[in-house]
């Protein structure tokens, strides 16, 4: 009997190991086929990573890679976040009612026309979950924010890339690319990474000209930097199929809290809410965002500082005989000849910038920093490009 138990135990263990090994070996076969070739988004390098890699003091590193607000969040937003810490044992308000109400008052819309996201990236993903099926088409600019393409591929849709002459979205070409399979069109204005923007008039005309089976998605991540931003609210009130997306990560300085929002018709937002995960925006982010939205003086101050920083960088780049793309946002796309090499050389000096994909491989993107950070970046550029 004891020998039988030994044999049974040995057989069971062998069988278990064999099946575990088979399960592990076949893991990719169990995955959604689309995930296997899915590119992974690469964010800007973190200060801690660069400090460790190059043995630098983190305090001496300038992170000019991710278009963050170098002056930080509004003091009132920071205070509101600290106060919210006392209640982190509780789940956040699931619908974000107070924040949606604050946003709706700011925009002159109803709160049920607002959807909150864990960053505006989540809103982009929700659009895919709700509207895209395999074989659908999504129209994007050649040099637009890469997440539109990544999301489309993950959903089984086909991203249709439209050339951007002079690094500006060609709305006529985008319109000509529409087919009966087109579901979504993404237009970021200002655009990341080029910093270019289409005029409000042409954006509104484009949105009004779209056929009924197409949803127009205007990414307004950098809209607070524009003197004359487009306004989709009249089209939204008409019930048109448009959605605008904004973030608290840029001028509001809340990138670390991951919070953004979209606004559109009640019907469109109601559909997106069906795909939204419960408690997707944490309580600290909600509290800080409400305070940030109210502090319009801080936003105006940061906008003015950014304008000054753009002028400082533009003058410095001209003195270095470097070409750049005039920007409507809080960064500059700079032609340095060899983008990857320059990125690495600057990084070794404690200046973190952003290298570009193959289609823009002669450029690096440099976020506007404080006056001192801009000065350090220009000095480092002069050193590495001599």
State where each predicted segment sits.
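PLP-dependent enzyme catalytic core of the Aspartate aminotransferase-like
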Residues: 19-22, 201, 345-353, 357-386
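N-terminal small-domain helix-loop-helix segment of the aminotransferase-like
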Residues: 26-121, 126
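Short acidic capping loops at alpha-helix termini that bridge into adjacent secondary structure
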Residues: 59-60, 110-114, 134-137, 181, ...
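PLP-dependent aminotransferase class I/II
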Residues: 74, 95, 241-325
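PLP-dependent aminotransferase-like
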Residues: 130-187
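Active-site pre-lysine segment of PLP-dependent enzymes
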Residues: 153, 171-181, 193-216, 220-251
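Conserved PLP-binding catalytic core of the aspartate aminotransferase-like
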Residues: 306-307, 315-349
């Amino acid at each position: 009997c004891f020998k039988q138990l030994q044999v049974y135990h040995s057989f069971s263990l062998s069988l278990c190991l064999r099946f575990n090994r088979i399960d592990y070996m076949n893991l990719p076969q169990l995955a959604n086929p689309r995930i296997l070739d899915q590119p992974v988004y690469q964010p800007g390098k973190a200060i801690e990573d660069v400090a460790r890699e190059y043995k630098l003091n983190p305090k001496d590193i300038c992170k000019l890679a991710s278009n963050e607000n170098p002056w930080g969040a509004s003091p009132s937003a920071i205070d509101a976040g600290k106060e919210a810490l006392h209640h982190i044992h509780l789940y956040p308000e699931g619908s974000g009612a107070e924040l949606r109400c604050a946003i709706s008052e700011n925009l002159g819309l109803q709160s049920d026309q607002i959807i909150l996201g864990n960053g505006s990236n989540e809103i982009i993903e929700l659009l895919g979950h709700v509207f895209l099926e395999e074989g659908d088409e999504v129209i994007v600019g050649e040099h637009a924010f890469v997440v539109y393409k990544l999301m489309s591929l993950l959903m089984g849709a086909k991203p249709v890339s439209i050339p951007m002459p002079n690094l500006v979205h060609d709305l006529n070409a985008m319109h000509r690319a529409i087919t009966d399979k087109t579901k979504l069109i993404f237009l970021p204005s200002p655009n990341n990474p080029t910093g270019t923007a289409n005029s409000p008039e042409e954006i509104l005309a484009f949105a009004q000209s779209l056929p009924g089976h197409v949803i127009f998605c205007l990414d307004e991540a950098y809209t607070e930097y524009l003197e004359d931003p487009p306004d989709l609210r009249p089209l939204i009130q008409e019930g048109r199929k448009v959605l605008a997306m904004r973030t608290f990560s840029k001028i509001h300085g809340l990138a670390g809290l991951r919070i953004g929002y979209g606004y559109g018709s009640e019907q469109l937002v109601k559909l997106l809410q069906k795909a939204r995960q419960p408690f997707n925006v944490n309580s600290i982010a909600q509290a800080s965002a409400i305070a940030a939205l109210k502090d319009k003086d801080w936003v105006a101050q940061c906008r003015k500082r950014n304008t000054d920083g753009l002028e400082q960088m533009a003058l410095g780049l001209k003195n270095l005989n470097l070409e750049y793309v005039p920007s409507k946002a809080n960064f500059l796309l700079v032609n340095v000849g060899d983008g990857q090499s320059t990125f690495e050389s600057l990084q070794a000096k404690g200046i973190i910038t952003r290298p570009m994909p193959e289609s823009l491989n002669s450029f690096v993107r440099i976020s506007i920093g404080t006056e001192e950070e801009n000065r350090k970046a220009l000095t480092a550029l002069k050193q590495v490009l001599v």
